[in-house]
């Protein structure tokens, strides 16, 4: 039976993870090994459990306990289940709960780039992408369209922030990922060198005079390719483009010269992930 606890005190410290800690505080939780993230909705939580992530506690509407969340709860032993009606939960968290369920989970230590890229042939590299919706959408496309791994630079949005996890529909738990470089100063020079040492050719998604079409046969022939996508608005840094082996453009019509980075990633993964 679930360990159900009716909420009577909004100030209870065990509710801090849902109501009062910032994303940065959740991520560090004083020490990296104590980091926490929030998964939202039964389907997303189930995918996290499938991937081996460990639950800490739940926050949900009462009706969810015997409804859509029941299968997830059956997998989680005695994890505390804090509950109230929807209006009270919205007052506590400051937002409407999607499908009425949140789960605080332990954040694992990140694997190394070498571990994530072992046996990988196509990887996505995300530079400075700060919008959590874009991060979630890119991870969903990466999982669906044949990317073997995703690498994020230190300036990227956290892939395990609540909105990114929700938008990804939990696919952030299905595709291997890690951070490339410990600090922003490690990218692009050290990060690119690491990719080249691992045998990857690098392809910058950018529009320059030297860009080749995304359907260029040379790209498809590369045994190991890292597809590098840049921040919203400004795109990739000039130093990143210069460090890449290829600069790649997506042919477009009606005078359009660029796509949102999430849309561009889906096109790139579809075309370049056919291996």
Predicted features along the sequence, with ranges:
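Structured adenosyl-cofactor binding patch, chiefly the S-adenosyl-L-methionine
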Residues: 103, 141-145, 159-173, 238-275
């Amino acid at each position: 039976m679930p360990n159900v606890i009716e909420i009577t005190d909004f100030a209870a410290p065990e509710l801090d993870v849902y109501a009062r800690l910032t994303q940065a505080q959740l991520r560090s939780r004083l020490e990296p090994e104590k980091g926490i993230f929030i998964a939202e909705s039964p389907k997303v939580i189930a995918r996290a459990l499938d991937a081996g992530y460990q639950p800490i506690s739940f926050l949900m509407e009462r009706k969810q306990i015997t409804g859509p969340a029941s299968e997830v709860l059956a997998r989680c032993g005695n994890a505390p289940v804090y509950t109230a009606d929807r209006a009270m939960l919205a007052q506590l968290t400051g937002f409407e709960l999607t499908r009425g369920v949140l789960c605080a989970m332990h954040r694992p230590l990140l694997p190394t780039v070498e571990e994530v890229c072992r046996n990988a042939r196509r990887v996505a590299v995300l530079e400075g992408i700060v919008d959590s919706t874009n991060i979630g959408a890119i991870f969903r496309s990466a999982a669906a369209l044949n990317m073997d791994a995703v690498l994020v630079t230190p300036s990227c949005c956290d892939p395990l922030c609540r909105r990114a996890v929700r938008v990804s529909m939990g696919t952030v738990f299905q595709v291997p990922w890690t951070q490339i470089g410990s600090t922003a100063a490690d990218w692009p020079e050290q990060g690119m060198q690491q990719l080249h040492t691992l045998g990857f050719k690098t392809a910058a998604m950018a529009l320059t005079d030297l860009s080749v079409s995304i359907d260029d046969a040379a790209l498809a022939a590369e045994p190991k390719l890292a597809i590098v996508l840049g921040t919203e608005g400004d795109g990739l840094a000039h130093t990143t483009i210069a460090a890449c082996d290829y600069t790649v453009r997506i042919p477009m019509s009606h005078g359009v010269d660029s796509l949102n980075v999430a849309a561009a990633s889906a096109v790139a993964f579809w075309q370049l992930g056919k291996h």
